[in-house]
Swiss-Prot record:
It is an enzyme of class 3 (hydrolase). SUPFAM superfamilies: LigT-like. Pfam families: 2_5_RNA_ligase2. This is Putative phosphoesterase SE_0715. A motif (HXTX 2) lies at residues 115-118.
């Protein structure tokens, strides 16, 4: 069973992000806009209830998270990914740190950069053109996310689905 943990924003902000993703993100149909808290990890099916309990325990002291998408940014030159940058807060960092440890399916490969991906799988020329447009359009969105979502990847459908949500705090 392949799982991941993410913060999923309100439907209205998902719609705003998806307006870009429909055009510029080749993973648009695979997953909704989100902030990755724990990248994909694999468990045995019989460990599912243990994982749910572990997630509940790890978030019990973490309050709902304020998310502020502040501007368009990118991961170039490492990869041609464009995203809406989310201001890193203590509570976001705490949530990330709870799940990126050796005792919970390993430490993250990359530093924590909270964001909503809006474009990926681009050529260098596409990247330059799209980044310029998106940067000009800008973003300034705030909301409080009260749930951590547990997602499961279906290899058959090549898609991520929310299978459980956990209330923060």
């Amino acid at each position: 069973m392949i799982l991941g943990l993410a913060l999923v924003p309100s439907k209205s902000f998902q719609d705003e992000v998806n307006a870009y993703r429909k055009r510029y993100d080749n993973h648009y149909a695979q997953i909704m806009p989100h902030i990755t808290i724990k990248p994909q990890f694999e468990i045995d099916d019989h460990d599912f209830n243990l994982i749910k309990n572990e997630v509940k325990n790890r978030i019990s002291s973490i309050k709902p998270v304020e998310v502020h998408a502040t501007k368009a940014s990118n991961f170039a030159p490492v990869s041609n990914v464009i995203y809406f940058k989310v201001a890193k807060t203590e509570s976001l960092e705490q949530l990330f740190n709870q799940f990126n440890t050796e005792d919970f399916y390993g430490i993250a490969e990359h530093p924590f950069v909270p964001h909503f991906t809006i474009a990926q799988g681009l050529t260098s020329q596409e990247f330059e053109d799209i980044y310029g447009q998106v940067k000009l359009a800008g973003v300034d969105h705030r909301e409080i996310i009260e749930e951590l979502s547990l997602l499961q990847y279906s290899e058959e459908e090549d898609k991520w689905t929310i299978i459980e949500t956990f209330t923060l705090g």
